[in-house]
Amino acid sequence: MVLMKDEVEVIGFDDAPFNKADKVCILIGTYMRGNRIIDGIYFRKFKKDGMDVTEKIIDIVKEKHYKKIKVIFLAGITFGGFNIADLWEINKETEKPVIVVIDKYPNKEKIFLALKKYFDDADERIKLINSFPEPEKMENIYVQYVGADKEFVKNVIKKTKLKSKIPECLRISHLIGRGFLGLR
C-alpha cells in the first residue's frame, strides 16, 4: 500500500458549460489539500474545439502551488467540445501524475465519427486519444492515468473524495463551472 498523508495536495480541472455559438470556454482549476481545504481557484479561457487546453492546464499547475501539487485530476480528456487534454504532455511538462475521472466508459466509435465529420485534423486527434491508456473501472467510476500506478491512483482518489464518487477538487470545479450558466 502506498502511504500518503490525508491532506494530499491535488488540483482538479473541469470546464464551464458552453453554448454552440461560443468560441471561447472557461477552464476551472481547484487546488485542494485533501478533500476539505480549498487553497486556490484558477480560471483560464481556451478555444472551444481548439487544441490549447493542454497548455492552459500546464500554465495553471506551474503557478503558485506547483511544488505542493502531487496529482492533477481531469474531468475527462476533452474540454470545451473536442479540445483534447494531452495526458502525456501534461505529465511530461509538470512531472506530476495525471488522473482522468469519468462516469461512463466513452463510446470511442461515436467520438471518432464526430471528429471525422467536423475536424480537418481528426486523424491527429484520434491518434492522440488512442495513445492514452484505456479507461478502467475503479469502484463506480472510470479512470485513465499517466505517471502513477493503480495502487497510488486508488489511494489518492480515496483520500480526496468526501461524499461524492469523484475527488472533491473535480466536484468543486464542476460546481463553479455551473455557476457560469447564470452569466448567459
Swiss-Prot record:
Natural source organism: Methanocaldococcus jannaschii (strain ATCC 43067 / DSM 2661 / JAL-1 / JCM 10045 / NBRC 100440)
Protein's UniProt name: UPF0215 protein MJ1150
Pfam family, one: DUF99
Record-stated family: Belongs to the UPF0215 family.
